[in-house]
Regions:
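Conserved C-terminal helix/tail region of periplasmic/extracytoplasmic solute-binding proteins
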Residues: 306-354
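Flexible hinge/capping segments at coil-to-helix
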Residues: 127-142, 233-237
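Short, well-ordered beta-strand elements
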Residues: 24-48, 67-73, 140-144, 170-172
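Secondary-structure end/capping motifs
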Residues: 37-38, 234-318
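Pocket-lining segment of extracytoplasmic ligand-binding domains
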Residues: 172, 178-270
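Short, polar/charged alpha-helical segment
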Residues: 36-68, 106, 158, 300-303
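Short helix-initiation/N-cap motifs at beta->coil->alpha
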Residues: 71-83, 96, 164, 169-184
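A ligand-binding cleft/hinge motif common to bilobed small-molecule-binding domains
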Residues: 94-106, 156, 161, 188-207, ...
Length: 354
């Protein structure tokens, strides 16, 4: 009887302990490889930025009191996101192609879940009175870019197409805010970037002399939502709901009737609406906000891996086998009735037949 009572007591204690564990809140840590103006915890230009500003993840788990969403925006961009993954401080993150490939090459256990911010154009702005009117004029000049980001690789590809390499220019490693300050004060001669440069030009503080928009599509930048493999394997149902939320944000961000509201939402980042209008001019929202892991996207990542190593930005070969994990995306698209909502593209950049 004593043994039975002891066993019952242990079972009860274990049950209470297990119940307490079950009630422990789960915090889903979501990172973003950028930060808003004046360090605002928002960004723009991607469906992931919409998910944050529109609280899509928070709404997805609104009826789950033990699940919390915690966003972190990184001034250090993609390289800082890799540190977060390496230290198990992030479960999901929006991240550009080059840093995510570097993370893969260095052994980070992640999975690519959906595209977000794919096909983003790159801009080149020159300081006023710099005498720079074309890419070839950059030789020997001080040029700002943020090392280790997808803009870094895109900039090198643009330079190479015009007969230059990274050693032909004086690279100054600056984040977005630093670039704006240095270009305005003319401490640098030119800079690669996007909306912050469009904004400077609109104020008359710099001149846009080039953009990849309308040029070779291989010069553009890609990005996506990356997940930590250990979290995905431990919480597949929650991972599915996270992807569902991102897909819903992508759908809303792709609807042309939402264009004005979308830019107003992204304005939470501090980027003026007219700048966003220019950034997305001549592009459909669906083209820029598609979450699809199609042949074009995969081929672009493969090319970025090869080019990244060739340019010395990635030290090892990048094994992409098994990295792309489309099953959660495909499930979301099927259940949300979005099978033909976005156009998929082949590796040659041409649309797939419907």
């Amino acid at each position: 009887m004593k043994l039975a009572s002891l066993a019952a007591g242990i079972a009860l204690a274990l049950g209470l302990f297990t119940g307490a564990l079950a009630e422990e809140p789960l915090v889903i840590h979501v990172g973003y490889a950028a930060i808003g103006v004046d360090n605002r915890p928002y960004s723009e230009g991607t469906s992931a930025a919409t998910a944050r500003a529109g609280e899509y993840l928070e709404k997805e788990f609104a009826n789950d009191p033990n699940i919390k969403i915690e966003w972190t925006f990184f001034k250090g961009a993609g390289p800082a996101v890799n540190e977060g993954f390496a230290n198990d401080q992030l479960d999901f993150a929006y991240q550009g192609d080059l840093p995510s490939l570097i993370g893969r090459a260095t052994g980070l256990k992640t999975r690519y879940l959906l595209a977000s911010g794919a096909r983003k154009p790159l801009y080149l702005a020159a300081a006023k009175a710099s005498g720079i009117t074309r890419i070839e004029d950059l030789k020997g000049r001080k040029i700002a870019l943020q090392r280790g980001t997808n803009g870094h690789l895109a900039a090198i590809k643009v330079l190479a197409a015009h007969g230059l390499n990274e050693r032909d220019v004086q690279v100054v490693n600056l984040d977005s805010a630093g670039t704006v300050a240095a270009l305005t004060s003319k401490d640098i001669d030119a800079a690669f970037g996007d909306t912050q440069l469009i904004n400077l030009a609109a104020k008359g503080a710099a001149d846009i002399i080039y953009t990849t928009k309308g040029d070779d599509p291989r010069f553009g930048r890609n990005a996506g939502v990356i997940g930590r493999q250990a979290f995905i394997e431990a919480h597949p149902e929650i991972t599915q709901r996270v992807v569902d939320a991102f897909v819903k944000a992508a759908k809303w961000s792709s609807d042309e009737q939402n264009r004005p509201a979308l830019f107003e939402l992204w304005h939470k980042s501090g980027t003026p609406v007219p700048i966003l209008e220019e950034y997305f001019s001549n592009d459909t929202l669906a083209y820029r906000n598609s979450p699809l892991i199609d042949d074009l996207l995969v081929s672009q990542y493969k090319e970025q891996a090869v080019k990244g190593k060739a340019f010395g930005l990635i030290r090892r070969d990048v094994d992409l086998n098994g990295w792309f994990e489309p099953k959660y995306l495909n499930s979301a698209i099927e259940r949300l009735g979005l099978k033909n909502f976005w156009q998929s593209y082949g590796a040659d950049g041409k649309p797939h037949a419907s």
